[in-house]
A protein has these predicted regions:
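Active-site-adjacent substrate-binding region
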Residues: 236-253, 260-264, 309, 319-368
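Zn-dependent metallopeptidase/amidohydrolase metal-coordination segment
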Residues: 269-271, 345-403
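Midchain, well-structured core segments that form catalytic/ion-binding scaffolds
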Residues: 102, 117, 126-139, 172-302, ...
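A non-catalytic alpha/beta surface segment that caps or lines the substrate-entry region
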Residues: 22-69, 73-75, 79, 89-90
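Short helix-loop-beta-strand segments that form the rim/entrance of peptidase-like active sites
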Residues: 153-175, 256
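N-terminal capping segment at the start of a domain
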Residues: 2-28, 130, 318, 378-379
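Active-site metal-coordination/substrate-binding segment of hydrolases
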Residues: 67-161, 189, 391
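Short glycine/serine- and small hydrophobic-enriched flexible loop segments
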Residues: 149-156, 240-247, 398-401
Length: 405
C-alpha cells in the first residue's frame, strides 16, 4: 500500500472530535479508525500494536541493530477538526497542477484558486489531493498518520540499521485533549517527533502559549417601555466588552510571532450573554499580559454596570515548548539533515497553534513537530500534494536511520 493509498483509506473514516463530549475519545468513530490502524500495523509485523481503553494506539518497530541509542517516537493524531464538516469526504487526486484554478465542485461553483491561496504556486507540477469543496480533507492529521505508517513499513523491510522506534496515534488533539491520557511512561521513548505540521520543509519547535477565556455577562431585563435608566442589556454589554480589546490583534491581522485574541463564539439576549475567546502568544510575558488585558476589560465592565456583571473564567491550555526543546537541539539538527538528504530545504517556523508534542514536552518527552505537506487545514479548501507525502515518508525513514548512525 502506498502512502497515498493509505491516506485515502484513512480519510474515509469520519473522525471529527467533539468538544462538548466528556468521553475519551470524544467520539466513538475515532475508535473505528484506531482499530483500522492496529490492523495495518499488525499486517506489517508490528506485533505489539494495540489500542488502549482511552482510544490511543501504540506500537513498536523493534531495533535491528545492537548499537545502544535512545528510543525515538513518531506521533500523529487521528481526529479531525470540528471547524468544518468531516463526513463523506470525497477526496480525489488531480493531474499535475498547472498553476491555475482547480474546480472542486462544478455544480456548486467551488474553486481552489491561487488568487486566494498563493501558496498553491509552490505545488506546480505536483499531483494534489483535494476535496469536493463541501468538507475538509483530513490531511490534519491523517497525512501524518499515513506517512508514519508508510515510513514504518520502509524501516521494517530495510536492512539499514535503526534503533527501537515507538509509534503512537492520539485522539482528540483538535479539541486540546490529545495529550490528556497519553501514557508517556508506557510509550517508552526518550525523544519523539509529532508529524502534524504544514507545507513540505516546515520544522517547528516553538508554539503558542495558549489560554481560553469564557466571559458570562449578567444583564437586567425590564419591560422596554419603562426601561430608561434601569435595563442592562447583556447582549449590548458583551459587544461593549469586546470593543475594549485591541481591534487589530485578531487572527485576521496577525502572523509569525504576533499573538492575538480570537472571539470563538458568542450568544446573547437581554438577561444573559456569553463570550468565548482563545488567547495566544509565543512570548510568555506577552501571553500573561494578554490575560491581564482580558481581566482589565471585565473589571471595567463591572465598574460601569456593577460588580458581577462580567464573570471571567481563564484557563491555560498549553505552553511554548521552546524551553524544553532548547536543551535537545540535536533533534532539530538531525531533522534538518534528514530533510536535506531527501532534497527538501528546511524551514524553521513558529507554530501558530499547538500540538500534542507541546504538552508532551512539558511531561518529559521532548517532541518537536515535522511537516505533513498539507495546506489550508480545518477548511473546505484543504489540500495536500501527493508527491510531498511520498517525500515525507522517505524523510521520516531517513531520520530514523540517521539517528542510529
Amino acid at each position: 500500500m502506498t502512502v497515498v493509498e493509505r491516506f485515502l483509506k484513512l480519510v474515509s473514516y469520519p473522525t471529527t472530535s467533539d468538544e462538548a463530549s466528556e468521553t475519551c475519545p470524544s467520539t466513538a468513530r475515532q475508535l473505528a479508525l484506531a482499530q483500522e490502524l492496529v490492523r495495518q500495523m499488525q499486517d506489517m509485523g508490528i506485533a505489539d500494536a494495540h489500542v488502549d481503553q482511552d482510544g490511543y494506539v501504540y506500537g513498536t518497530v523493534p531495533a535491528n541493530c545492537d548499537k545502544k541509542i535512545p528510543v525515538y517516537g513518531l506521533i500523529a493524531h487521528m481526529d479531525t477538526s470540528p471547524d468544518a464538516p468531516g463526513e463523506n469526504i470525497r477526496a480525489r487526486i488531480t493531474e499535475p497542477y498547472d498553476g491555475g484554478d482547480i474546480v472542486l465542485n462544478e455544480e456548486k461553483h467551488i474553486m481552489l484558486s491561487p488568487k486566494e491561496y498563493p501558496q498553491l504556486k509552490n505545488s506546480v507540477g505536483k499531483r494534489l489531493i483535494v476535496t469536493d469543496g463541501t468538507t475538509l480533507l483530513g490531511a490534519d492529521d491523517k497525512a501524518g498518520v499515513a506517512e508514519i505508517l508508510s515510513a514504518a513499513q520502509l524501516l521494517l523491510t530495510s536492512e539499514k540499521p535503526h534503533g527501537t522506534i515507538k509509534l503512537a496515534f492520539t485522539p482528540d488533539e483538535e479539541i486540546g485533549r490529545g495529550a490528556d491520557r497519553f501514557d508517556v511512561k508506557g510509550f517508552g521513548a526518550d525523544y519523539a517527533y509529532t508529524v502534524d505540521g504544514g507545507a513540505l520543509g516546515e520544522l517547528e519547535y516553538e508554539n503558542f502559549n495558549a489560554a481560553s477565556a469564557k466571559i458570562e455577562i449578567c444583564g437586567k431585563s425590564i419591560h422596554p417601555g419603562s426601561a430608561k435608566g434601569q435595563m442592562v442589556n447583556a447582549a449590548l454589554v458583551a459587544m461593549e466588552l469586546h470593543g475594549l480589546l485591541p481591534a487589530l490583534e485578531t487572527p485576521y491581522y496577525t502572523e509569525k510571532y504576533k499573538g492575538f485574541y480570537h472571539l470563538v463564539a458568542m450568544r446573547g439576549e437581554t438577561e444573559q450573554a456569553e463570550l468565548q475567546y482563545i488567547i495566544r502568544d509565543h512570548d510568555r510575558a506577552k501571553f500573561e499580559a494578554r490575560k491581564a488585558v482580558m481581566e482589565k476589560a471585565c473589571a471595567e465592565i463591572d465598574r460601569r454596570y456593577g460588580a458581577g456583571t462580567a464573570v471571567l473564567t481563564l484557563r491555560d491550555s498549553y505552553y511554548n515548548m521552546k524551553e524544553k526543546i532548547a536543551p535537545c537541539m540535536f533533534l532539530i539538527e538531525n531533522a534538518k539533515k534528514a530533510m536535506e538528504s531527501v532534497g527538501v530545504t528546511p524551514k524553521i517556523v513558529p507554530i501558530r497553534g499547538g500540538t500534542d508534542g507541546a504538552r508532551l514536552s512539558f511531561e518529559g518527552l521532548p517532541c518537536p513537530n515535522l511537516c505533513t505537506g498539507g495546506e489550508n487545514f480545518h477548511g473546505r479548501f484543504e489540500y495536500i500534494p501527493a508527491d510531498d507525502m511520498e517525500t515525507i515518508t522517505n524523510l521520516l525513514a531517513q531520520l530514523m536511520w540517521q539517528l542510529a548512525e
